[in-house]
A protein has these predicted regions:
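Conserved SGNH/GDSL esterase-like catalytic core that processes O-acyl groups on lipids
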Residues: 1-64
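Alpha/beta-hydrolase-fold catalytic nucleophile elbow
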Residues: 43, 81-82
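Short "lid" loop at the C-terminus of a central beta-strand within the Rossmann-like core
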Residues: 46-47, 84-87
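Alpha-helix N-cap and loop-to-helix initiation/capping positions
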Residues: 53-61, 95-103, 138, 142-146
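Generic structural signal for well-ordered alpha-helices
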Residues: 62-67, 108
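Substrate-gating cap/lid alpha-helix
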Residues: 88-125
Length: 165
């Protein structure tokens, strides 16, 4: 994004985070910080899919996360990558791969549809290759190079939204 934009950033990440745990953390965090954000990049969904959260619950909680970011942290724009296609993860096999893959796809389609109705929100499809050479050793997480690609795509989505403001 630099040098076109002045960038300061804050990373909030937690292994196993779900929409619910993120919402709880944001509610708690808002009393501790007075930060405001022009753009927020929210990567949630994998852990909700693995826990087989219903579409309705997932969408409601994801929307609540976006709402608190806008209301309490003044987020003008929100960029959301899609729910990764768990059915392609090398670490998952057999029935687990099929069930989680189908569920993640349903959540992703519902999220894409919901976000298409919001202004100043961008959905980025998750279309990275899920080959062994693009994944970390655990076969579940992207490797460093894949995160670079995700970051570049996120930056492009942010740049597009900011230009629309």
């Amino acid at each position: 994004l630099e040098p076109e934009f002045s960038v300061t950033w804050r990373l909030i990440a937690k292994t196993g985070a779900t929409c619910r745990s993120t919402l709880e953390m944001l509610i708690d965090d808002r009393t501790k910080h007075t930060d405001t954000f022009d753009v927020v990049f929210i990567a949630l969904g994998v852990n909700d899919a693995v826990r087989l959260r219903s579409k309705r619950t997932f969408l409601r909680r994801h929307q609540a996360v976006r709402a608190i970011l806008r209301a309490q942290f003044s987020a003008t724009s929100i960029v959301v990558p899609g729910v990764p296609p768990l059915g392609g993860f090398p670490a998952l096999t057999g029935l687990m791969r099929w069930v989680l893959g189908a569920h993640a796809k349903r959540l992703d389609q519902a999220l894409s549809s919901a976000l298409s109705k919001e202004t100043q929100t961008a959905y980025l499809s998750f279309d990275l290759p899920l080959t062994a050479d693009a994944m970390a050793e655990d076969g579940y997480h992207p490797n460093a190079q894949s995160y670079v690609v995700l970051g570049e795509r996120g930056g492009s989505g942010i740049s597009t939204l900011v230009r629309q403001i």
